[in-house]
Design a protein with these regions (language model features):
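Secreted/luminal cysteine- and crosslink-motif detector
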Residues: 12, 19, 40, 61-63
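Short amphipathic alpha-helical heptad-repeat segments
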Residues: 3-7, 11-22, 50
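Short intrinsically disordered terminal tails
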Residues: 1-2, 47, 100-103
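Intrinsic disorder/low-complexity segments enriched in small, polar and charged residues
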Residues: 27-30, 75, 103
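Short, leucine/isoleucine-rich alpha-helical interaction segments at C-terminal helix-coil junctions
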Residues: 80, 97-101
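Acidic, low-complexity, intrinsically disordered interaction modules
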Residues: 38, 45-83, 88
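Flexible coil/linker segments and helix-coil junctions enriched in charged and small residues
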Residues: 25-47
Length: 103
């Protein structure tokens, strides 16, 4: 069960990172450095990541109290498609958009 606690701790760390990313995104949006469509798209990706990590935590807690199995956790994690807005390519696109707006 120690590994389940480690998974919970790690996921909560990433939930905090998602919240920080959301704050940074809101800040650059409020400064007028990205448009509304880009902001909404990136915000949805961050929220999706945050919800994914929270789902993993919920499954882990259910495993600890005996309501779920590790197989459910394995299947959930196995089927995750990572679509982070923080990938290098997408981050470069945001920076390019900011630079274009400054011209």
């Amino acid at each position: 069960m120690l590994y389940i606690q480690h998974i919970i701790t790690t996921c909560m760390y990433y939930v905090k990172l998602c919240k920080k990313q959301n704050e940074k995104l809101l800040k650059i949006y409020n400064l007028g450095q990205i448009n509304t469509k880009t902001y909404e798209y990136k915000r949805q990706l961050i929220m999706s990541d945050e919800n994914m990590f929270l789902d993993i935590v919920k499954i882990c807690i259910c495993i600890l109290i005996g309501k779920d199995s590790t197989e459910k956790l394995y299947n959930y994690i196995k089927n995750i498609e990572f679509k982070r807005w923080t990938t290098t390519k997408e981050f470069k696109e945001i920076l390019e958009e900011i630079q274009l707006r400054k011209r």
